[in-house]
A protein has these predicted regions:
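C-terminal His-loop and adjacent cap/lid subdomain of alpha/beta-hydrolase
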Residues: 2-640
């Protein structure tokens, strides 16, 4: 029985008029809809919450369909025979922009949309499939159509944090499709507010707030900027969100092994398949592997290699009744253990067929508290070594996404603004090298460089609060007033079967760590990009909220900071900055660029960077020097 029943092609066209990407040649895109049919009785599928309640076709299978997008070499013989399936992040494609250092666009069609062409020059076939039922089909976002469980009711919990005062808020994360309330007058619905992170929730009297319609709430006086609001209410007819795992798996299965007669545009062209996910979709990958759902209905291990990126130690509401796959709340079912490799990959070990995994994180995943749980025991008292089939890397001194130069004024996803200028370190070259290392590991048996992360044993794993004195000594710096760690949570007796009780019972916080720092305030542990090895600034993975957006002093969830060194020794002595000035480090711009070139070559030799990125790294360092000098001058004037 076929898992993919049909590819409905809407568009198929050659990219850029046939312009070649190096030796790979021209690429084409295929855009369409994939139709699926899954066996609900299959032992693996019984893990999908409520699949037994889903409507079935005459063959007893559950049908669903998702948006499909494919980039492939026109001549498959010129490709590398590798599929990279990029799990969309909240409906958006990410692989081309992060690996190719390109702008993020929904339908890459112009030369600039492919950046440096890395994935294409290396011959990858890149695919996407919509996997979220709650994604609106707007701005090219990709979604999954799944059955709804008609007549099933239950509780939903939504969290919102506005950056400005607003009169109403939707019952969904960001722009996603809400679960509507079943009763506008529901007296059991609850709204709580916390004035800042870590504060005790205060219940808002029911008379002070209301459902303005089935998908929005309103509050007397409006919702305050920076405050954290949670609403718990009843809804009906939940989507079968867990089918997203099967959509991702079966798309790759079909592309790898289905014959040309089935309409497979990649028939016979793919030898290997790799799975990539960033942030929310990185957590999706961890959850998928935890369930062992990288194995298809025929018992084949679909993915040879997996790259969960900036997913931290969490999973998500990806297999929950009334689950919100886009939810980014820390106190969610996605923050339940297990966290480290021993627990997350237990099912893979038992079956004996295991993909190679390279897990990468940036610094904010450590400062929010969950990333260190990947490589400690549950009590945070000892290091837990990664499994032999895993490499774990911290990209030291980075923020959640590659730093832009010049930096953005606000987070492009959330609109959040920081007190400090955002982190400008570009970790994309590290990510490109990680993919090459994964491919060589799978294809040639060449093991990647050893894992690099903060360790208790060597003192590089420290509590975040211990770093406050150093950062506080840097003039003009605002260190977070509160470090909030994830807590032990209890979502009730039915959580194991995918039904959560709200609010959860919260226990003691976990013991978590960040990397220690050097004399410049830059992180010691992890893979250090050239920006840290030849520094012009302190690059942190933390930033605090802009006071104009409320809750000043609260930690931002995804952005770091760039704290430029003083320009001259006189600037350093006048301001009392504990860090050496730029002029004391480098005799000239040329000397600085030579240092960048030297340290980049060392990273290439260690296989942390690729030789093809050397000149691009030096060119960016040239621009970084100019920008940092501008920022150093501005800072010196403001402190004089």
């Amino acid at each position: 029985m076929k898992m993919v029943t049909n590819l409905e092609v809407h568009r198929r066209e050659v990219l850029l008029g046939g312009k070649p990407f190096g030796q790979t040649g021209a690429y084409e895109k295929v855009i369409g809809t994939i139709h699926f049919a899954a066996d609900p009785a299959h032992p693996l599928h019984r893990q999908i919450t409520d699949i037994d309640l889903a409507p079935k076709n005459r063959d007893g299978r559950v049908e669903f369909s998702g948006d499909f997008y494919l980039l492939k070499p026109v001549d498959p013989q010129k490709g590398n025979g590798r599929l990279l399936l990029d799990v969309p992040n909240r409906g958006r494609k990410v692989a081309v922009d992060v690996f190719n250092s390109a702008p993020r666009v929904p339908d890459p069609s112009a030369p600039e949309h492919f950046g440096n062409g890395f994935l294409m020059r290396h011959g990858y076939t890149v695919a996407w499939i919509g996997w979220q039922p709650d994604v609106p089909r707007q701005d090219g976002m990709m979604a999954l159509d799944v059955p709804r469980l008609e007549g099933v009711t239950g509780w939903v919990r939504v969290q919102r944090r506005p950056n400005e005062r607003v009169d109403t808020m939707p019952l969904a994360d960001r722009y996603h499709i809400p679960y509507p309330t079943i009763d506008l007058e529901d007296a059991q619905a609850r709204l709580t507010v916390r004035e800042r992170s870590g504060a005790t929730p205060v219940e808002v009297p029911r008379s002070a707030w209301r459902f303005s319609d089935a998908t929005h709430i309103a509050l007397d006086g409006g919702f305050a900027p920076g405050a954290i609001y949670q609403v718990i209410y009843r809804s009906a007819n939940p989507s079968l969100v867990g089918l997203g795992f099967l959509a991702v798996r079966d798309t790759a299965t079909w592309l790898r092994w289905a014959p040309e007669a089935s309409g497979n545009p990649c028939a016979g062209a793919l030898e290997r398949a790799y799975l990539f996910g960033l942030s929310q979709s990185g957590r999706f990958l961890r959850h998928m592997l935890f369930l062992g759902l990288d194995e298809d209905e025929q018992g084949r291990m679909v993915f040879d290699g997996v790259m969960p990126h900036v997913g931290g130690g969490r999973r998500g509401e990806f297999n929950l009744r009334f689950g919100q796959p886009s939810l980014n709340m820390h106190a969610s079912v996605g923050s339940l253990p297990p966290f480290n490799d021993e627990g997350v990959f237990e099912r893979l070990r038992k079956r004996g067929r295991i993909p190679r995994i390279i897990a990468t994180n940036s610094t904010p995943e450590y400062w929010r508290g969950d990333a260190s749980l990947i490589h400690t025991d549950i009590d945070g008292t000892r290091d837990a070594e990664p499994a032999e089939f895993v490499r774990t890397y911290l990209f030291a001194g980075t923020q959640h996404t590659p730093g832009a130069l010049p930096p953005l004024a606000a987070n492009s996803s959330t609109g959040d603004r920081g007190y400090h200028v955002f982190n400008v370190v570009d970790y994309a070259p590290l990510l490109r090298a990680a993919l090459v290392n994964l491919d060589r590991w799978v294809s040639e048996g060449v093991e990647p460089p050893p894992s690099r992360f903060p360790r208790l044993a060597d003192g590089t794993a420290v509590e975040a609060e211990s770093l406050a004195p150093f950062y506080a000594a840097i003039p003009g710096t605002r260190f977070p007033q509160r470090i909030v760690r994830p807590s032990k949570l209890d979502f009730g007796p039915d959580c194991e079967r995918g039904v959560a009780t709200y609010p959860p019972k919260a226990g003691a916080p976990y013991k978590t760590y960040v990397s220690s720092i050097d004399a410049d305030g830059n992180e010691i542990a992890g893979l250090r990009a050239p920006e840290l090895e030849a520094p012009l600034a302190t690059f942190t993975g933390w930033n605090t909220r802009d006071p104009d957006t409320g809750a000043a002093g609260d930690l931002m969830s995804m952005n770091g900071s760039t704290l430029p060194f003083p320009f001259t020794r006189a600037d350093r002595e006048r301001t009392g900055d504990p860090r050496l000035s730029i002029a004391e480090r480098y005799a000239s711009k040329a000397a600085y660029l030579e240092r960048v070139r030297e340290t980049t070559r060392k990273s290439i030799a260690a296989r942390h960077l690729l030789a093809e990125d050397l000149e691009a790294v030096v060119d960016r360092a040239d621009r970084l020097w100019d920008w940092i000098h501008q920022e150093s001058g501005r800072a010196a004037r403001s402190l004089s």
